[in-house]
Amino acid sequence: MNHLRLIQGGAAEPIEGGRSFSHAARQELVPANGDVPAVCMDQILRRQFSEERLQADGLRIDPRLPVISGETGLRLPTSGEVADRTLALAIVGAKGSGIPQIEVERIIDERGAYGLFTPREQDFIDEVLPSVEERDRFSWRYEAAWTLMWALRHFDAPLGRPATRCDSDRLMDTIFDIPDLARHRLRAPNDILNEADLAYRYHMAALRVGRADEATLPAIDPEVARERHHALSWLTCHDAIEWDELTGDA
């Protein structure tokens, strides 16, 4: 196998069977160099798997996109941290979708959600009459909350292609019915990284819409892709960057 070709975006042999790449997490292809981390085989295989998925969906891949983090050295947040972030996202999503301010405050009080919001989220929560644009922007946080509920094992189905909005009623009903969102352990690092790599490449494909090199985008909702990418990036990089600092533009 030509490892250099893989790193530069070439294809390896077709991946057979499942999607577990943990066995390759310690097969280092390129050693660390200063602040640049090592590249391991699981990162390469994960990228290849994602690119094959995108091509099957009729999307043109961008071979210039790098690999994402691998399992080696990965530090996921605790279930409690993910549960807190999920609850905050669901509440701002609900306010963005139009529930009354008094109902927002009741939910925060009942779930003890004080202090869970980022600075930008708190500003939105405190604004009694936010603009239509603000409401629309924060209403999409339902998608990020759904993604984290999947990571917390409350939803079994794979995330799949970011083509349609999540079932926000089911999301909120599930959250209200479960007092302890952190009652399960997080999904395995391999599974989270698989979805993170897919979300990254779907979102980058969505960002190419309207540019000279990409005129159409088959069956992808750009906003769903963005929120899913944001949530999974936070899961895999939470100890290096705050939620509000993640832009999802690259």
Please provide the spans of the model-predicted regions.
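Extended, charge-rich alpha-helical interface modules
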Residues: N2-A250
